[in-house]
Amino acid sequence: IKFGTREETLPLPEDAAEDAKAETVTVDNIINNPNPAWAKAPSELKEEDYKWFYRELYPAQFEEPLFNIHLNVDYPFNLTGILYFPKLNNDLNIQKDRIQLYQNQVFVTDNVEGIVPEFLTLLRGVIDSPDIPLNVSRSYLQADGAVKKISNYITRKVADKLSSLFKKDRKGFEEKWNDIKVVIEYGMLSEDKFFEKAEKFALFPTTDGDYFTYEELQEKVKDSQTD
């Protein structure tokens, strides 16, 4: 299983000069793990297990992820995976291609465009599905029935996770807002189904440092007009 990359030193040829320097190359860090975290049921994993797996995937990433979404469904398609929300701030040069695609625990690619909605390619993690066709064009992927269902499922799971965090810990959600708003606002502009869910937890900051949802702002405007 691919877990990040590592540097390897190439051996020098026999006729190399005495002062020749060995060349180093970056290679995939492959680990033989027959039971990776994403293949386990969510009930089998603790919070520390998710953090440990993130460190395995991204050994050069020192910041902890904000939270994760565990994907686990076997009908009408088969999909497992773990997605992580990294701290994004307002960085417009965010590196994509951080989500790795596997089929039956065999690494395929880290380009998931056409499979994962564009706005979610800002996340990190792993998805594994035998139902995603390989070696086909992006337009073919986007037209494939199973891929459409997988894409919609991932979008819904991310929206549900964000909604749950907002409802359970409003203050904590507000504290994370500047680190996650890039994904949420991008998703609201590009995906109608995500917008329908996200408009209930998307936040608008005020100059006083308070945060309001769109519905709350409407109520405040009504109240001020009544006064």
Language model features with spans:
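Conserved GHKL (Bergerat-fold) ATPase module
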Residues: 1-227
